[in-house]
Structures are given as C-alpha cells and as structure tokens.
Amino acid sequence: LFMIPKKIHYCWFGRGPLPDLAKKCIASWRKYLPEYEIKEWNEDNFDLDAYPYVREAYDSRKFAFVTDVVRLYALYNEGGIYMDTDVEVLKPLDSILHYQAVSGFESQTRIQTGLMACREGHPLFKELLEEYDNLHFIRSNGSLDLTTNVTRITNTCLKYGFVPNNKLQTVNGFTLLPCDYLCPKDLETKELHVTENTLCIHHFDGSWLPKSVKRKRKLQRLLGKRITSWCVWLKRLCSI
C-alpha cells in the first residue's frame, strides 16, 4: 500500500508564461507518471496573505521564495510529490512512494528541495512549515531575507541527527537519498553524474538567483574547479 499519494504539486506564480524548459519538464512528468494527478499552485488557489513572508516575497517579485512556503503547505496538507518546474523525470517514481517522506542530497552536505515528497500530515513538514509563521521576507532594515529553503531544511534536519555525507539515511521519518537518485547535476559545474539509480534531473534553472551570482557561477563553470579554487586561494593570499 503506497503511503505517498500519486499527486504532483508544482508552483507557478507571477502570471508569466511557462519557459520552454518548464514545458519540457512537465511533459516528462506526463510521460512517465501518466496516472498521477498534477496540480499547479498559483495566485488563484493559494492565499498570499496566509503568511506575511509569502506576501512580502510576492510583492518583491521573488517568486521562488513564495514557493518555498507553498511547497511545504501543499505537501503537509495534501501529501504527494512536489517538483520544481526545472525537474525532468527520467523514469517512474513509484519506487519512492513507500516512504513516509523523502528527498535527497543536493551536494555532499546539503538537502535538495527541487523534489520532495511526503504523506499528508507528516510531522516534520508541519515543523518546517510552521517555521514561516513568524518569519518576514523583508527585514526591519528593509533588506531581503534571501535564506534559501535548502539552508533552512538542512539546518532543521541537523537538529535531528542529519549526517551531511551524501549517504542514504532517515532523519525523523524523512528519508534522504544520495545525489544520484534525484539530483545528479552538480549545482556549481552543471556536470551530470547519471547512474542506474537516477530517477530525475534537477536542471537548476536558478531563476531566483541575482545576476551577479549567475555570472559568478558561469565563470566558475568556464574555469573549472581547480582554477576556481586556485583563484580563491590567490585572492585570500593577496588580502593578507
């Protein structure tokens, strides 16, 4: 008996058209998950004023941070699988439905949030969602709180014994799979490491990233890890 319902949640806020990558990825969901219900969350079916954080992020047009809350709300209240619109499915996902809750590693040390799944009412997702009850996206000094949900969820799981080692583990009923299952693409280099375990690819479109960060990451990919590390070392040496 499956514990996680065959229901896919995704978010699209801002009223803009879906980019080609999103259309391609959603088409892959329909191809490999034909019996799954697919639900889009947007301004019409989510109350933006339910959380001050959401309203402030929305009005700042930082829609990715809106989805940080909405994905947790959808999963906690309805159960199912949440996917970012830049997640391409490569094969059926039935193999993860027996877990109480499941995600995976984004890197050797961090939990990815591009694909998350749980049964309705999972207590850890309740805690993760409630963290936003008293949060504001716009700080008292007017700056924006750009803390990612990857950081928030990783930090919460650390309280429950999460070991940042890219190895299969279950933390407070939340099973975490190694990178190659759900997130085989390196966030920094964009290199793909697909294995027989790989179920999907998170393409890391990164629409929420500031342009300066996008430029920095593009430069890092062009230079490669070794040269980038050498440049960082040289910069630190020169600043001494």
Protein language model regions, located:
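Glycosyltransferase-associated regions of secretory-pathway enzymes
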Residues: 1-67, 83-240
